[in-house]
Amino acid sequence: LVAGYTGPGGKTILPGKAVAKLDLRLVPNQTRAEAEKKLRAHLDKHGFTDVEVNVSGGYDPTEVAEDSRLVRSELATYKKLGVTTSLNPRMAGSWPGSTFTSPPVSIPAAHFGIGHGSGAHAPDEYFLIDSTNPKVAGLVDATMGFAEFLYVLAAIK
């Protein structure tokens, strides 16, 4: 939220405008367009009809059935590589998966991979290139994991 004087020191002036940047997260069965309409309706209901809303991006939700060939192949690959798994049906992050899962393409899409990294999109983001711990995968192991996944995917009907 930015409003009023933002330079050095302080000034007691009334702001001519205020700007708020929002990051909306969707709940199951909600679309980006629906979230935008609900935001507009909420502002209007509370007397803020003069507030301008500029949408700068966003994606519809992505969901893939647990029993889909894609997810079964991912789980089989993890098992073959000796990786303990857990399914996370909803992520806090965003990605344009709906480009693939919605018409006209309508194919399953999901996140997958082995390897260790953290801090996605942060200044301290990292991915382990070479691991000295046999229980922690580095870049080579991650790459081979993707190759193994393709073989498993081809074998599963």
Please annotate each region the language model reported.
Residues 48-54, 157:
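Flexible, glycine/charged-enriched surface loops at secondary-structure junctions
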Residues 35-44:
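Short amphipathic alpha-helices in soluble, non-transmembrane regions
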Residues 62-80:
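Short, low-order "capping/linker" segments at domain edges
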Residues 11-36:
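C-terminal catalytic subdomain
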